[in-house]
């Protein structure tokens, strides 16, 4: 039994380890990887490895892994990466896993400056990356420094601006807040929609020379072949769409492209090494195939995938809406709970006040009862005194009568009796006065007693009202919220050729009608303008790179990726080939 070979495959967000047999083909390994990660849009991807000479190469799917020049390590190392890029991410990337892998790969390329990205766009893209990672901004969770360990901007951008880590975070956080309510997968798609308009996005660059020996760059991408001057990778000077190319071939370092236009000469360039031509041929074949596939009706498989993706997205939206609804319900329940607690406290306070008032009224009642008793006692004393005085008066009357009789009987002692009579008369007058006074006093005490009795009755009535008032209702119970292979061909010979068919294709050059996301989306346009003016104040102009200068010139001239594309494809194929030869 042959000994198995250990293999490690690194995707953009995981490390996979497999044991393969010595006779395992590239396709078998590739199929095992895509099955493990759950990927169906396999035509974009490939397995990359470093060969024994240190060059990065794509694994050929039709050959055994062991027959390829993979650097001898244990385990054998491969990277699972996007080999071909879509023309329009929002139209072509169907599965969420595909979108995420592209998002992570493009983000890494931007952060490493493999794709040039202007500073304002870099900050906006960073905010989408943050939304994709953290979800909605929440100041309770996302405290200052929450982005401290995240790599969000290219080093070039950091060095070109006089801003601290905290100031960068503040700017990114402000835009992060703007994306509230955006699903994580939608944030990744928004990132890609902006990134795909960057000039270097999805372009494979190769150093070439024309017949004159001028050093140039060949750019191979989803839309065709473009020629760049050696000091400018941003702005292509000549373009050939895939629909104009009939045959591609190479012989050693010479690469020949035959146009569909029979009147046009062959398009010939030279690469520094044979292996470069092999890579160019493989990329041309793969990109041409995808270019043509996009311009034909979707296969049944793609239609099914799109329908499934739509259903999954709809389901996620429903789940999110349900989650938001539950969240709102929970917030309402929390507020209701707080309101009930507040009302409960208010009712308890009122109850305390009523109890205090009741106690106060009770004390007042007791005091008034005491006073009423005292007044009643005083009234009784006054009455007794009045009765005593009445008796004395009667006695005096009797004495007066007796004296009067005595006076009549004793005329002789008239003077003496008259004096006594006068004395008793005076005494009677005094007693009359005292009696009157006591009667008035008794009447006054009687009135006071009546008033006290009325106060007592009133207080009793108030107390009765307070005590019989219904107790405050208990707070209602708080109900808890419910919560393709495109083989580079194993050419032992130093030549290879491929026919590129253009049959059955609709609307060959639809890409020339495209506009950038900034032109389509007013919100993105305003965001980028605001960021640009904000960053301009902190920019160190002495640290501009060649790409910064070239980008600024393009912006000033009103050029963008698609306007340039239309411009470099003008004229017939022969004119553009002549132009290439003259460079």
From Swiss-Prot:
Residues 5-295 form the FERM domain. GO terms for cellular component: adherens junction; apical part of cell; cleavage furrow; cytoplasm; cytoskeleton; filopodium; microvillus; plasma membrane. One of its GO terms (biological process) is actin filament capping. Its main location: membrane. It is a peripheral membrane protein. The modification Phosphothreonine is found at residue 564. This is Radixin.
């Amino acid at each position: 039994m042959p000994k198995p070979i250990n293999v490690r495959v690194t995707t953009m967000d995981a490390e996979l380890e497999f044991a393969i047999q010595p006779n395992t083909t590239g396709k078998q390994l590739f199929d095992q990887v895509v099955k493990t990660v759950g990927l169906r849009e396999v035509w974009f991807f490939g397995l990359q490895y470093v060969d024994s000479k240190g060059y990065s190469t794509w694994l050929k799917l039709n050959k055994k892994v062991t027959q390829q020049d993979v650097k001898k390590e244990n385990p054998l190392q491969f990277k699972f990466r996007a080999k071909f890029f879509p023309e329009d991410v929002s139209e072509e990337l169907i599965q969420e896993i595909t979108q995420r892998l592209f998002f992570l790969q493009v983000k890494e390329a931007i952060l490493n400056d493999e794709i040039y990205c202007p500073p304002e766009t870099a900050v906006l893209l960073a905010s989408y990356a943050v939304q994709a990672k953290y979800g909605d901004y929440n100041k309770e969770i996302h405290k200052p420094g929450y982005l401290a360990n995240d790599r969000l901007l290219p080093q070039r951008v950091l060095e070109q601006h006089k801003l601290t880590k905290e100031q960068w975070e503040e700017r990114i956080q402000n835009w992060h807040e703007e994306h509230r309510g955006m699903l994580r997968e939608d944030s990744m798609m928004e990132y890609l929609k902006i990134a795909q308009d960057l000039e270097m996005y999805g372009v494979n660059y190769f150093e070439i020379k024309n017949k004159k020996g001028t050093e140039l760059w060949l750019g191979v991408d989803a839309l065709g072949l473009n020629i760049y001057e050696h000091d400018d990778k941003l702005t292509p000077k000549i373009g050939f769409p895939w629909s104009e190319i009939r045959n591609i071939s190479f012989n050693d370092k010479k690469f020949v492209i035959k146009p569909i236009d029979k009147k046009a000469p062959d398009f010939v360039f030279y690469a520094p090494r044979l292996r470069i031509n092999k890579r160019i041929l493989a990329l041309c074949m793969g990109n041409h195939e995808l270019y043509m596939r996009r311009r034909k009706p979707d296969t049944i498989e793609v239609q099914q995938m799109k329908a499934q993706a739509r259903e999954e997205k709809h389901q996620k939206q429903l789940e999110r809406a349900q989650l938001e609804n539950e969240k709102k319900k929970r917030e309402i329940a929390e507020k209701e709970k707080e309101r009930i607690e507040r009302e409960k406290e208010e009712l308890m306070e009122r109850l305390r006040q009523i109890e205090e008032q009741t106690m106060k009224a009770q004390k007042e009642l007791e005091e008034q009862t005491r006073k009423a008793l005292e007044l009643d006692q005083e009234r009784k004393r006054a009455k007794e005194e009045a009765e005593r005085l009445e008796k004395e008066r009667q006695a005096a009357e009797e004495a007066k009568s007796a004296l009067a009789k005595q006076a009549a009987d004793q005329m002789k002692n008239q003077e003496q009796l008259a004096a006594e009579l006068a004395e008793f008369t005076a005494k009677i007058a005094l007693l009359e006065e005292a009696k009157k006074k006591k009667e008035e006093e008794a009447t006054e005490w009687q009135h006071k007693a009546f008033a006290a009795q009325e106060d007592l009755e009133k207080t009793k009535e108030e107390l009765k009202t307070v005590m019989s008032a219904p107790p405050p209702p208990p707070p209602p119970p708080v109900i808890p919220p419910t919560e393709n292979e495109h083989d580079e061909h194993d050419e032992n010979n130093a030549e290879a050729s491929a026919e590129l068919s253009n049959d059955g294709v609709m609307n060959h050059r639809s890409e020339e009608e495209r506009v950038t996301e900034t032109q389509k989306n007013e919100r993105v346009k305003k965001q980028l303008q605001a960021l640009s003016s904000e960053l301009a104040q902190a920019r160190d102009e002495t640290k501009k790179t060649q790409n910064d200068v070239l980008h600024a010139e393009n912006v000033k001239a009103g050029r963008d990726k698609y306007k340039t594309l239309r411009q470099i494809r003008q004229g017939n194929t022969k004119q553009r080939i002549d132009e290439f030869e003259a460079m």
